[in-house]
Structure formats: C-alpha cells, structure tokens
Amino acid sequence: MNKYTKPLNTTSLVNTYKAARKRLFLFDYDGTLTPIVNNPADAQPTSALLHCLQLLCKDPANTTWVISGRDQLFLDTYLGSKIPRLGLSAEHGSFMKKADIYDWTDMLKDADMSWKEKALAIFEKYTQSNPGTVIEQKKSSITWHYRNASDIQKTYVCVCVYMCF
C-alpha cells in the first residue's frame, strides 16, 4: 500500500470541474495565496492573484471564499473592495462577510473576551525580553509573532509560553 498522496490527475480534475453544477473554493491567505513574509503588512495580493480570484468569482457556478487570520479592514481593503462575489472570513472565522454584502457578521458578539487581558500581559513580558518578537492584537485574538527572533530564542520562548498556558 502506497502511503504517499498520488499525483493529481489534472485531466480528471478539469473534467470534473467542467461537469460540476456547483463548486466551492476555500482559500487561506497567508502562506497559501501569498507567501509568509517577515513583516505581515508586506503580504499584499499580487495583480495575478487578484485576477485569478476575479476569474473564479465571475463564474456563477463557483462560490469562492478567502479564510484568513487577517482582520476585516485588511481583507476589505485588499480583496473585498476589488473582487465582486468573494466571501471573506476574518480572524479565523470570528467575522464573516458573505459575497456582495457590505456588513460583517460578528460570530463572537456574545463571547467572553476577558482572557485577552491576561494573555496580553504574558505576551508583553516575553516581547520585552526577546528582540524580534511583536504582538498583534485583533478584536478576537492576540498573536505573538516570533519569526524574526533568533532560532535559540524561538525554541526557548515557545517552551516558556507553553508552560504559562
């Protein structure tokens, strides 16, 4: 038995795509549609990416979504305002915006977010003592970026933060 994924049969894929009456495309943003970069603000969509998404969204048989850890403003600015019929999911599903709808739906409107204060205090402690690390606050989450820290710091800090939680 082969334990590896078989190569994609592109002929079969194209035939299945053409025969389908409805198609669903779900794309992640960072690391999928755009490469992982040292500064998250630099991960802006290319004109080629926007063109591909526009082509997918123009086909009425397609339902296309971008699901991201990015916030609503970023997704609206770089994708939603440029591509009709594109659904958006911000902050890993915390906020949803159906295609061609102006308003976002807050999926966490009744959630207890009191945990953020304690988590932020822990992240601030480690950020101060670890050069190259930064805190990114969003409405529904706090992300601690350590990709620009040294490799030794990354390992040490990950273990320390894990022990805190």
Q: Model-found features: residue ranges?
A:
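Non-catalytic pre-domain segments flanking phosphatase-related domains
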Residues: 1-29, 34-37, 41, 48, ...
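Alpha-helical structural motif
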Residues: 9, 115, 119, 156-158
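Residues that form generic nucleotide/phosphate-binding pockets
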Residues: 16-17, 122-126, 164
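Residue-level detector of short, conserved catalytic/binding motifs and their immediate flanks
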Residues: 23, 86, 142
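Short loop/turn segments at strand-loop or loop-helix junctions that form parts
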Residues: 27-32, 91-93, 99, 138-139, ...
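Short acidic, gly/pro-rich beta-turn/loop elements at beta-sheet edges
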Residues: 41, 98, 154
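Active-site phosphate-binding/coordination module
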Residues: 44-137
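Conserved acidic, metal-coordinating active-site core of Asp-based
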Residues: 129-165
